[in-house]
Amino acid sequence: MAMESEVQPKVHIVLLNWNSFGETSVCLTSLKDLRYDNRVVIVVDNGSTDDSVARIKAEFPWVEVILAGKNLGFPCGCNIGMRRALEDGADYVWLLNNDATADPGALEAMVAKAESDPRLGAIGSAIYEMEEPSKLQAWGGGYVNFWMGHARHYLAPIPDQKVDYITGASFLIPRAAMESVGLLDEGIFLYWDDPEYCWRLKRAGWKIGVAGDSKIWHKGMTAYGKKSPRMDTFFNASAARFFREYSPIPMISVWVGVTLRMGKRLLMGDFDRARAVWAGATQKNSVPAPGRVMSMNSNRPTIKSDPQVEPKIESENHFERSAGGRR
């Protein structure tokens, strides 16, 4: 049974779009059927060069669209939506990948899980393969192996205390947690932002959990074809940043992981991707790691820091939501 709307916490759902109206529209269509009334949907457009924005505004007028102005990457784009949600009084922010679809009870189950324990700082879903709807892609998230320098999703139900991170494909964050540790790490462009945030939460005393009744269908990596050297660069730059901050054995974590990933690509004869692994792992980053700031300074980080560009809100019905969304 759904919560009574007058007692439902307010949830802002944040999606990113970048030249992908087809996927975004399928995701938004699934959100119309959520059994949760007190919700607001925000789409942050990360500098699309196609007609995505115009089509989203035309076909989904109940969605608030924010223009980032350029492709800022996943964490920066999400942070724009998260800041807007916090300004609008959100009790929770649900980060949802635009290539995912939600079961009608997905959000209700996540909020129920969150409300059951005030120390939960991140709540995930049971995520299934879009191409094989009965196949589990991740039980909320997964675990990190510091000795091997990698992370792996759990492919079966597992107790919450064994889950190291919640995958960003479906990630519910309470307002109190954001006020405690801040937003996503803007020194990351893509990949590893979800383990980083969960480790930061745990360092600050928060727990993470999985709402098994919250079902999400998400495209697997196989649906996108072969990865590119550019993706390898992003992945390994982000992995190195994570391990240098959170691993008890950072040099081992970084270089064992790099060696294994480079070796795999060399055995495949993919020398461009092998070079990209090295380039990413040795890339310098001038943005301080949030974990480092938290470990050195007990003051809470701001949740309203300026994004890299001034976002533009594109919503003609800024205060008029869908029938399911209320201010």
Regions found by a protein language model. Name each.
Residues 166, 190-196, 231:
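Acidic donor-binding loop at a coil-to-helix junction in glycosyltransferase catalytic cores
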Residues 67-88:
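Glycine-rich, basic loop-to-helix element that forms the pyrophosphate-binding segment
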Residues 229-240, 244-327:
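Non-catalytic, C-terminal membrane-associated alpha-helical segments of glycosyltransferases
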Residues 76-80, 100-182, 187:
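Acidic/His-rich active-site region of diverse nucleotide-sugar glycosyltransferases
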Residues 39-47, 66-68:
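Short beta-strand/loop segment that forms part of the nucleotide-sugar
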Residues 29-38:
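Short, acidic, metal-binding catalytic loop of nucleotide-sugar glycosyltransferases
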Residues 186-189, 195-217:
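Catalytic donor-sugar/metal-binding loop of nucleotide-sugar-dependent glycosyltransferases
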Residues 90-101:
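Short beta-strand-to-loop acidic/aromatic patch adjacent to the donor-nucleotide binding site
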